[in-house]
UniProtKB/Swiss-Prot annotation:
It comes from Prochlorococcus marinus (strain MIT 9303). It is found in: Cytoplasm. Keywords: ATP-binding, Cell cycle, Cell division, Cell shape, Cell wall biogenesis/degradation, Cytoplasm, Ligase, Nucleotide-binding, Peptidoglycan synthesis. Cell wall formation. InterPro entries: Mur-like_cat_sf, Mur_ligase_C, Mur_ligase_C_dom_sf, Mur_ligase_cen, Mur_ligase_N, MurCDEF_pg_biosynth, UDP-N-AcMur_Ala_ligase_MurC. NCBIfam families: murC. It catalyses: UDP-N-acetyl-alpha-D-muramate + L-alanine + ATP = UDP-N-acetyl-alpha-D-muramoyl-L-alanine + ADP + phosphate + H(+). Its EC number is 6.3.2.8. This is UDP-N-acetylmuramate--L-alanine ligase.
């Protein structure tokens, strides 16, 4: 059943210095961590000072605190080989460091080209999809690690098992998260490709769903074999996968996880392969979407030749990546959870999991919450504009909603794509649902203070800086004025 055949090779000399412009980004830092641990001289620049940058420095990466031409001069001195410069889509052509690298005639690679080289250099599994790819690749990495495979991992989130988003393993396998946001995943030629699901997103890059489908098809064709989600209508209609998985049926699929029990602290399911029951698993995570992510990870491991019995033993160690229903702490009787959900489908799935925790009375939180206060930060004007009414429908699953200003992610404003417009859409669709809009982040913390109740689950969602809400709550100043309470 094993797929793997290509020998482990290296496309880069270990003497090759590598410099990352924007090294603190989640995708860039993962590559930097792997390469520095493989013996390369690695440097980078990033104006942000955060735990990622601290981790890079601790591993031996030289990180400049600005992005200037002087950095290029510094890394080019006293080296036998000129540095290779790596950039991401987020780095504009006007970046002074990038301009200096071009003037110095340094070789410049997009991060996707570097990742593509790593993927092709050893047996690899690349995980793509609109939703769940970070969780799936994290669960896959963890299962491989707990079965003594020690994979190399390039993930778009922190893998709890390694407490890192990048790991230079000594095993034969590489796991990579394949981001579709800029279309660069078509460069990846993995031994096994995995597609978790597909629906329209990243409308700043894709004109329509057909363009996204065609891009993902190119990714699938570039992989030696393809594992896909049978429960996704778009994948089922448009893709010819080598193997399929489902959490709804065991008929006509290669792998299935059929739930027996779904509650707020775990999921129990029967596992099937080719229609044959293999055994039962207990997943220490709630939510049908997490069961699907776990089934994808298990299926990928089985295709890589691992035994089901070994995988069963590793399931107890599974944890989602950082910022996926991430319990941050308790504040004045409220439990604060942070989640990366920033698409209507993700918001809906996250709120469904929160509701399951409330209704079942079972949870891995310190105590079962009684009510859900959704604190949502829309991410990108283009996404807010495209999915305004879908976001309004999804947020209706909460008991009350607070909205932060749109996190631009570098985009220019679009008329009507505002948090106030979203609030109005919520009021139309859910007239009895309390909703309020914050003018800024400081007011948002005051709104949480005013509108939440003891026993609430304060669920912060978004891909911007909403993860700082917990820190802000612990530093609340006494406010003289605040809008009327939603909690009444």
């Amino acid at each position: 059943m094993s797929l793997w055949f290509c020998p482990l090779t290296s496309t880069l000399s270990r003497q090759q210095p590598i410099h990352f412009i924007g090294v603190g980004g989640i995708g860039m830092s993962a590559l930097a961590l792997i390469l520095v641990n493989r013996g390369h001289i690695v440097s980078g620049s990033d104006p942000r000072e955060n735990t990622t940058v601290e981790r890079l420095r601790a591993q031996g990466v030289r990180v400049f605190r600005d992005q200037s031409a002087a950095n290029i001069n510094a890394i080019c001195s006293n080296v036998d080989l000129l540095p290779l410069v790596v950039i991401s889509t987020a780095i504009p052509k006007s970046n002074p460091e990038l301009k200096a690298a071009k003037l110095s005639q340094l070789k410049i690679l997009h991060r996707s080209d570097l990742l593509a080289a790593l993927i092709q250099a050893q047996p690899s599994i690349a995980v793509a999809g609109s939703h769940g790819k970070t969780t799936t690749s994290t669960l896959l990495t963890t299962l491989l690690a707990t079965t003594d495979q020690d994979p190399t991992a390039v993930i778009g989130g922190v893998v709890p098992y390694y407490d890192s988003n990048g790991h230079a393993g000594k095993g034969r396998l590489l796991v990579a998260e394949a981001d579709e946001s800029d279309g660069s995943l078509v460069k990846f030629q993995a031994t096994l490709g995995v597609i978790t699901n597909l629906e329209l997103d990243h409308t700043d890059h894709y004109a329509d769903l057909d363009e996204l489908i065609n891009t993902m098809k190119r990714f699938g064709r570039g992989c030696r074999r393809l594992l896909a989600n049978f429960d996704c209508p778009i994948l089922k209609e448009h893709f010819d996968a080598t193997a399929w998985w489902s959490v709804k049926t065991s008929a006509g699929v290669d792998f299935a996880a059929l739930p027996i029990c779904l509650n707020g602290d775990q999921t129990i399911a029967d596992i099937y392969e080719q229609g044959k029951r293999m055994g039962q698993i207990t997943l220490p995570m709630p939510g049908l979407h997490n069961l699907s992510n776990a089934m994808a990870a298990i299926a990928a491991c089985r295709l890589a030749g691992l035994s089901f019995e070994d995988l069963q033993q590793g399931l107890a160690d599974l944890q989602p990546p950082g910022r996926r229903f991430d319990f941050r702490g308790t504040w004045e009787g409220r439990q604060i959870v942070d989640d990366y959900a920033h698409h209507p489908s993700e918001v809906s799935a996250t709120l469904a999991m929160a509701r399951l925790i409330v209704t079942s009375g079972r949870s891995q939180l310190p105590s079962p919450p009684k009510r859900i206060l959704a604190v949502f930060q829309p991410h990108r004007y283009s996404r807010t504009n495209e999915f305004l009414y879908e976001f309004a429908r999804a947020l209706g699953e909460a008991d009350a909603v607070l909205l932060a200003p749109v996190y631009s992610a570098g985009e220019n404003p679009i008329q009507g794509a505002t948090s106030e417009s979203l609030a109005n859409a919520i009021r139309i669709q859910h007239p009895n649902l309390p909703v309020a809009v914050a003018e800024n982040f400081n007011q948002l913390t005051l709104l949480v203070q005013k509108h939440s109740l003891k026993g609430d689950l304060v669920l912060a969602m978004g891909a911007g800086n909403i993860n700082n809400l917990w820190r802000q709550l612990t530093r609340l100043d006494n406010a003289k004025t605040c809008p009327p309470s939603l909690a009444a």
